[in-house]
Amino acid sequence: CAVNESQVYKLADTTSFEEGAMTEPVACCLHGLDMCNITPASTVLVIGGGMIGLLMVQLAKLAGAHEIILSEPVAVKREMGLKMGATLTVDPINDNIPALLADKGIHRINTVIECAGLPATIKQAISLAGNKSVVMMFGLTKPDDEVAIKPFEIFQKEIEIKASFINPYTQQRALDLINSKKIDVSSMVCDICSLDKLADILSKPELRNKGKYIINPWQ
């Protein structure tokens, strides 16, 4: 098929097609991160340790965040988060997160990046956000989901609630990061599978929990 040249981006000789396939999600994350006001002194909480959450951990590190906390219930994803640059991981099901953070000397979160897309985790993001913080609603909710919030809490803490939609003008920057190996997209891909394995992967949570799959229809 023919594609407009403005939509074509060149992979480096050292970048595989599998790595190149990750450019779009990295670009989306970059757009969201640009809106988060992260500075070298920032403490960042990422909620959700799937592929998007792990990309956000890496990008927050590249942005210079001082502390990067990953909240994720699956142990293997927490371990991956530490490898990707998180300074601390927490289990939202079994940990008392405010008490754990206080015990670690973390008393204010400047940026919360919500990557799970659940009403419960959006409420949690607002609850854990510090004074004058940014809450980035990045995770995709269902269209008819509703979230009960306490407006006074947002008012009292002067929270900015933001949302990010797709990837305007960040595709080339994302590919530059991948080409330069400044961001690791390969470690998050657990397997490259043929099309006939797709139904099995989608139907089994234990397979999906292993990480991100790339489907190669010609394999």
Give the location of each predicted region:
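C-terminal hydrophobic helical "lid"/dimerization subdomain
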Residues: 123-127, 168-219
